[in-house]
Amino acid sequence: MSSQFDQLKLWSVLVGDTGDPALIKTLGVQDATTNPSLILKVAQEPKYQSMLTEAISWGIRQNGDDVQTLTFVLDKIQVNLGLEILKHVPGRVSLEIDARLSFNTEAMVQRAIFLSQLFEKMGGDKKRLLVKIPGTWEGICAAEVLESQGIACNVTLIFNLVQAIAAAKAKVTLVSPFVGRIYDWWIAAYGAEGYSIEADPGVASVANIYSYYKKFDIPTQIMAASFRTKEQVLALAGCDFLTISPKLLEELKKDQQPVERKLSVEEAKKLDIQPVELSESVFRFLMNEDAMATEKLAEGIRIFSGDTQILESAVTEFIRQIAAQEA
């Protein structure tokens, strides 16, 4: 019997949820995805200091003001890591724009264009890049503009079906619903000791999005993310993409128990699902009605924003040191 890892690959594209290029090459996955938290972790490792130093030197040479230089450096760090990761996966890498722009459509568009252009300028294939955009209304509007300009987007921090429907309407390439964070909220909110996999609210959320998309032949891809357990991963066998931490990937490789496909287009087509007519006001109302989605979206933005600020502080100190050496 083949491993659960190999069995899952029959129905789903497996994605490495890490920003560490050295780790990625050991995982045997198709794609990779990063976020500010993962990039911060990698940037703090001694073995990647040369990559960080190169990005800082490059940013300084662009002759911008202090704010612009910091922006240049942060995006160059992402691109450096992304290009290194792509040496070890055959598919795509997802790079994320600054979470502090989450409610500014124009700023997100401009930053994503800059990131995409820098990626190409440094030798990257644009077809192998997904720009991660937060699943706010403003973010989804930005993704719509970017997709129309040929920049593929991964709309992330998806916690409610309405976000996924809005992203589909915007014709985005891919959405990332967060299984584990939904599960965490329900545990914390209701004091439950846990949910069976059949009743797992995070698994159910992704399954609902999958069913809606496949029922109505929506081409936007679904990449389930933020898994807490191997059982959650297996419960979504058949989802388009599964982005999985290195720890859980290793667990899947070691287990040879049979895996059953849980999601399929054929089964989704049989479901009685009504299409949702969506507008900005409907989007905002339905998000407001969902305390979990509202809170987890806000929390996700805060976490990514906070990690970006920590990374900025580290980069600012490096810039100061380099400037002092050159003085």
From Swiss-Prot:
Transmembrane segments: none annotated. It catalyses: D-sedoheptulose 7-phosphate + D-glyceraldehyde 3-phosphate = D-erythrose 4-phosphate + beta-D-fructose 6-phosphate. The keyword Cell cycle does not apply. SUPFAM superfamilies: Aldolase. The active site is at K132 (schiff-base intermediate with substrate). Gene3D superfamilies: Aldolase class I. Its EC number is 2.2.1.2. Pathway: Carbohydrate degradation; pentose phosphate pathway; D-glyceraldehyde 3-phosphate and beta-D-fructose 6-phosphate from D-ribose 5-phosphate and D-xylulose 5-phosphate (non-oxidative stage): step 2/3. Belongs to the transaldolase family. Type 1 subfamily. This is Transaldolase. It comes from Chlamydia trachomatis serovar D (strain ATCC VR-885 / DSM 19411 / UW-3/Cx). The lineage of its organism: Bacteria, Pseudomonadati, Chlamydiota, Chlamydiia, Chlamydiales.
